[in-house]
């Protein structure tokens, strides 16, 4: 795997690290990726994964995987397993064992007691609502809790009672004693521990008090010897608390936090809470729906690990929040698939063509390239007969001078085959076209037409060589560029985010896919000529009907359709 982050990159993180190496030539760079196991990873997490793991690789350091498992109510083993699989799939390996913040609960508890003993923490019995009210706002200072000046002895006893489960949830919490008038709201006596009676996936029922993210995060970083703790800009103010906790405990290693801009992508939302709403309302079909930008959703859609890494490298790391064009993500996968995807033909929404001057028993084998520019990818065989399918969109009954595909009295060339001319149509009782009767120029194979223009080319499949398939055409989930900024984001859903069409693929291609499905399935990518790049949906596909997910169109046509 190529690491695109290099020591000569002109970004602020590179400059910070190089300055640190100038000050300490023996510095061992140590980063970490610390997800909370309460959901699935998305493209925004991929940006952080690439940053942390590749910096460690480039600077010959280490990168830890640590689960920030401080809220047992929202966490689940299935998320842990999914996150580990996604990181490996992206091409990275963490340093030594997987780590958990819960491993450090005993020592975190001791650090909390140390703050109490220094008069820097107290047990508060205000309700959540009262704490919120006492905290104040950006324009008004907070006010002290009536429990703020309890003695050290009393606070130690009360904290022990919390640990023993002698308080109910919400009856007490441990707060840092900092400054209720601070201009940073996060520094207005933040909660360090709260009571949660819930079974933890790692520690089971050993604990009923749990450290908050802010308390556990900085101490876990320092316990592990993390030298550079990277997070997104929304945690910029939290750095003050990060540093305060480390400064006021006896921890030996002092980690440092640095912030970079989070990923904001056009026509998308990356908030776990909002994605959960989409799933609960059945707007999308779970966390691996290709319309949401989870790693599992992108993988199901046909995105490769290398294309996601390429995207993360291209957008770079900055301190300025900006909205990344969706077309850049599509460009990365389109560029890759253009090189390696097998070219084949698929017909969506088919209509039948009958070539009346070709014998019924005629069956001609044609050898076509798997990729016109990469001959090493080989060839495959297609069959030409007198009855074929073309796409309904490739025929127009009413005369239209601008229409360049098949119409009555006009010609088209069948891809890799002959020129045909439409002469008449057959309809059913409802007036729907069921068959187009055409003449086939049997002297046109591989030749330009004589004394007439070279016609447009359309794709096709012989009925005898067809295999039924379903095609899922995915588009952006939202109609506006930045739905994440809208309070009523559901009002901007794109009703055409998923269009399902039926049709056919080449039989021999289908047979190869089915054979691979019965063994260890390796994702297969295709360019269905004139249609787009597709992958096999290995979950929904059956032996009698394959399902294909459109990964990306052949060209960036989204902006043209809006």
Swiss-Prot record:
Please report the name of this protein according to its UniProt entry.
Glutamine--tRNA ligase
User: What organism does the record attribute this protein to?
Assistant: Buchnera aphidicola subsp. Schizaphis graminum (strain Sg)
The residues forming a coiled coil are none
Q: Which Pfam families match?
A: tRNA-synt_1c (PF00749), tRNA-synt_1c_C (PF03950), tRNA-synt_1c_C2 (PF20974)
Please list the GO biological process terms of this entry: glutaminyl-tRNA aminoacylation; glutamyl-tRNA aminoacylation
A single GO cellular-component term on record: cytosol
Q: Where is this motif: 'HIGH' region?
A: 35-45
Q: Where does ATP bind?
A: 36-38, 42-48, 232, 262-263, 270-272
The question of whether Amino-acid biosynthesis is a record keyword is answered with: no
Q: Which InterPro entries match?
A: aa-tRNA-synth_I_CS, Gln-tRNA-synth, Gln/Glu-tRNA_Ligase, Gln_tRNA_ligase_bac, Glu/Gln-tRNA-synth, Glu/Gln-tRNA-synth_Ib_cat-dom, Glu/Gln-tRNA-synth_Ib_codon-bd, Glu_tRNA_lig_a-bdl
